[in-house]
Amino acid sequence: ESRGLGDVYKRQALMVCDKPGAFVNERAARYGIPTFTFNPKEYPSKADYEREIVRRLRAERVELICLAGYMRILSDVVLEAYRDRIVNIHPSLLPAFKGAHAIADAFAYGVKVFGVTIHYVNGELDGGRIIAQRAFEYLGSDPEELEARVHAVEHPLYVETVAKLVAEQ
């Protein structure tokens, strides 16, 4: 819920969420953003719910997909429909510390320079082409404080990066 998105919010056509009770649904409603919320368990297969996602995205003429907190690996159903048009945010300086526990893994490893990466999504976990990165030094010893610092860096970077991508379209 970063400020300063301007035209990015105005152009957002659809918010897709795989968690029916998630607070992000309320946020989207507050901004007047249409939402497709689904429960993956209600579909016979991953391919079925991903086909429905693609159908809805196409119906809204979505050109760019921006993932945030979507903790599922996208299959070729979505990747082929939106090749080079899906971006994700990751809480490490990729290619280091891929996966869902990047902050904890980097902290446990003793890293002193942390960061955030915005990247295109491809078939490899956190393996797409890097669009933007921002690093910062952290010498503290509190993992919760580190996580808060990561989020303080990633939100503005994602807003800036998405705004640039939208402006280029």
Regions found by a protein language model. Name each.
Residues E1-Y9:
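Single conserved hydrophobic/aromatic residue that forms the stacking wall/gate
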Residues G4, Y31-G32, Y82:
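Short, structured coil segments at secondary-structure junctions
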Residues K10-E52:
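Short, surface-exposed acidic-centric catalytic microdomains
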Residues D18, L64, A68-Q169:
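Donor/substrate-binding cores of folate-linked one-carbon enzymes
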Residues K41-L67, R72:
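Short phosphate-binding loop-to-helix
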